[in-house]
């Protein structure tokens, strides 16, 4: 699978932003159809991590189709959602017309200092060109004493939806496609130490990282295959640029590896993620 470097030049960072924006514009609907059911597993832990209460002002960064913002609103929280992808924001607005959704870059949030009681980001961290800058900007918009929380994936050996695709691509030896940018490793924050250092380095107090593990059912291989291609930006690009024979080989490798998680008719895939949180002093 594609691994990207740890440090980006400004040109590489912009290339990554363009890739992420364009890919998620394209994948917005198919992402929602398949992957929202996966990412919503982290919503309740995130809201608990920031002690979200009724009438809190909450910022949801990398809101995607707006699922976390919608759940927060159901709990009486006043939520604003932002995302780099206009396609995702259009989908979020359509699904949740009563919530304020805006297109915005996490490194340049259009809010005054201390605007929010809490900030959350559900599986956005590994998509940002400069995670340290993104976290700092989130904290800037947070009031003193407010809390911020980020979710990100655990190692692919534990997070098997992405892990199975990653391993199948590597097994076949598929060459990285030219449109995948050089960037940071998407699994940098699968390491608890790296995640903790990110939070502490941003000046947060009581920073902690917790592990969460669950399972996700998928009825058949076709759903897994189409879901991955329709939801995972790097995976979709990596596979989409291969010739037909290589794509067939990747699918065969995926099927063989997924058999370990097929107790009966469908698949039960382990999924694991981390919640990193802290308080603004």
Where would I find each of the regions flagged by the language model?
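Conserved Class I S-adenosyl-L-methionine
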Residues: 9-13, 65-67, 185-281
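A structural alpha-helix within SAM-dependent methyltransferase catalytic domains
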Residues: 47, 70-73, 132-139, 166
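A short SAM/SAH-binding and catalytic strip from SAM-dependent methyltransferases
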Residues: 118-132, 154
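Conserved catalytic/acceptor-binding region of the Class I
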Residues: 132, 140-219, 243
């Amino acid at each position: 699978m594609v691994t990207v470097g740890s440090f980006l030049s400004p040109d590489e960072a912009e290339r990554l932003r363009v890739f992420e924006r364009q890919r998620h514009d394209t994948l917005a609907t198919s992402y929602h159809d398949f992957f929202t059911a996966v990412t919503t597993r982290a919503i309740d832990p995130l809201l608990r991590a920031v002690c979200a209460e009724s009438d809190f002002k909450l910022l949801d960064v990398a809101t995607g189709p707006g699922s976390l913002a919608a759940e927060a609103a159901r709990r009486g929280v006043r939520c604003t959602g932002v995302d780099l992808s206009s396609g995702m924001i259009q989908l979020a607005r359509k699904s949740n017309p009563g919530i304020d959704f805006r297109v915005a870059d996490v490194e340049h949030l259009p809010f005054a200092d201390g605007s929010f009681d809490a900030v959350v980001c559900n599986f956005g961290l590994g998509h940002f060109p400069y995670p340290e800058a993104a976290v700092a900007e989130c904290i800037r918009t947070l009031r003193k004493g407010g809390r911020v929380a980020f979710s990100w994936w655990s190692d692919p050996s534990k997070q098997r939806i992405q892990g199975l695709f990653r391993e199948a691509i590597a097994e076949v030896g598929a060459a990285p496609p030219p449109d995948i940018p050089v960037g940071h490793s998407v699994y940098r924050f699968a390491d608890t130490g790296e995640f903790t250092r990110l939070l502490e380095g941003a000046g947060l107090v009581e920073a902690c990282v917790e592990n969460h593990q669950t399972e996700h059912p998928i009825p058949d291989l076709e759903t897994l295959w189409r879901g991955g291609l329709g939801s995972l930006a790097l995976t979709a690009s990596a596979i989409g640029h291969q010739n037909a024979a290589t794509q067939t080989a990747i699918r065969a490798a995926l099927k063989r590896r997924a058999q370990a998680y097929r107790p009966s008719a469908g698949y039960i895939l382990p999924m694991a993620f981390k919640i990193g949180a802290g308080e603004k002093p």
